Amino acid sequence: MASFPLRVNEKEIVRSRTIGELLAPVAPFDKKCGRENWTVAFAPDGSYFAWSQGHRTVKLVPWSQCLKNFLLHGTKNITNSSSLRLSRQNSDGGQKNKPREHIIDCGDIVWSLAFGSSVPEKQSRCVNIEWHRFRFGQDQLLLATGLNNGRIKIWDVYTGKLLLNLVDHTEVVRDLTFAPDGSLILVSASRDKSLRVWDLKDDGNMMKVLRGHQNWVYSCAFSPDSSMLCSVGASKAVVAAILV
């Protein structure tokens, strides 16, 4: 699994040098799951980077601080973990109004990650509902984690707090993707042969279930205008769905 910030033009990417490594802790935490490092993701604006460290944990890293740390140390002794491993403590020293690192315990093996950012003028599809538990501001940044037990947990990136627990899949959540239009529509792909569409602006209510795959669903992606969703799975077929 690889991830680029949205502003990066993949066609312009040339052979690049390594600037650093993020290393998972060696010792297990309280005998939790193993050291699986299966997924990474950038926030849409490049402000944060998330990666699954194993042991059921995800690390949220302010990318500008992380990159500064790498450039400060340079590329020498790249295999020396002591020089490039990020601290497990909050990197801002407790100062307010600065991006902070967070270690999130997701409660199960993490298979998928996705960032979502809010655009206030994008209203919930459920227009008749006047009251919502959550009202996301313009600067809202969320992280969705897909777990081995079929659950999806939604976290506030800035505080590291759990906001929503989406429960409907019966198997591993293999992939997650947010609509790129800022509507906070989330789609999940699962081994239960289905995709589910969630409206986070409607407190995470599930809008619809998409079926058509005969086997596990591995990955899904929105079109740039958020009107179409494509998915692939073990059945060796691409399934396209129009969401508008």
What are these language model-derived features?
Residues 36, 45, 100, 109, ...:
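WD40/WD-repeat beta-propeller blade-loop signature
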Residues 58-63, 152-155, 176, 195-199, ...:
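WD40-repeat beta-propellers
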Residues 52-55, 146-149, 188-192, 232-235:
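Conserved strand-to-loop turn within each blade of WD40 beta-propeller repeats
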Residues 29-37, 75-78, 104-110, 167-173, ...:
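WD40/WD-repeat beta-propeller blade N-cap
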Residues 57, 151, 170, 193-196, ...:
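A conserved positional marker within WD40/Gbeta-like beta-propeller blades
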Residues 41-46, 114-120, 134-140, 177-183, ...:
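Loop/turn segments within WD40 beta-propeller blades
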Residues 1-39, 65-99, 120-133:
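Intrinsically disordered, low-complexity acidic/Ser/Thr/Pro-rich linker and tail segments
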Residues 49, 143, 185-186, 229:
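Hydrophobic beta-strand positions that form the internal "hydrophobic ladder"
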